[in-house]
Amino acid sequence: MASNTSFLFVTVTLLLVLNVSSRALPPVADSTNIAARLTGGGLMQCWDALYELKSCTNEIVLFFLNGETKLGYGCCNAVDVITTDCWPAMLTSLGFTLEETNVLRGFCQSPNSGGSSPALSPVKL
């Protein structure tokens, strides 16, 4: 009885292995070319926006601390690209709270973000 069970188990296992190993593999995409992936648009655009955001950190700090309503076009563009085209939670992972991220996104997406819309009141320490 144990011999029949063992034989059946080995036979089924062998048939499964042969079935899986003989299937046709899908063609591999050209994902090994790192230059093509980096210049493909999306990833590079996210890195550029992150670099631009790094250069406008002072503007963002003043925006929240002093209630200044001036964020440059490049800074707003970086916030917009990061929150819409890249990983939306990236600003949160950089240390901004979810509320601050939403305020930045709302300010930069408003039609009059050129300097006439009010910002948050200054933080009192």
UniProtKB/Swiss-Prot annotation:
- Keyword Mitochondrion assigned to the entry: answer is no
Which Pfam families does the record cross-reference, listed alphabetically?
Prolamin_like (PF05617)
Q: Give me the Gene Ontology terms describing cellular component.
A: cytoplasmic vesicle; extracellular region; vesicle
Where in or outside the cell it occurs: the entry states: Cytoplasmic vesicle; Secreted
Query: What residue stretch is flagged as signal peptide?
Result: 1-24
Q: Name one GO biological process term.
A: double fertilization forming a zygote and endosperm
The superkingdom listed in its UniProt entry is: Eukaryota
Q: Which UniProt keywords apply?
A: Cytoplasmic vesicle, Fertilization, Secreted, Signal
Tissue specificity, per the record, is: Restricted to female reproductive tissues, specifically accumulating in storage vesicles of the unfertilized egg cell.
| Keyword DNA-binding recorded | no
Main location group: cytoplasm
User: InterPro entries given for it?
Assistant: EC11-15, Prolamin-like
Function per UniProt: Involved in the regulation of gamete interactions during the double fertilization and to prevent multiple-pollen tube attraction; mediates the redistribution of the gamete fusogen HAP2/GCS1 to the cell surface after secretion upon sperm arrival.
Protein family (similarity comment): Belongs to the plant egg cell-secreted peptide family.
**What PANTHER family does its record include?**
EGG CELL-SECRETED PROTEIN 1.2-RELATED, EGG CELL-SECRETED PROTEIN 1.5
Q: What is this protein called?
A: Egg cell-secreted protein 1.3
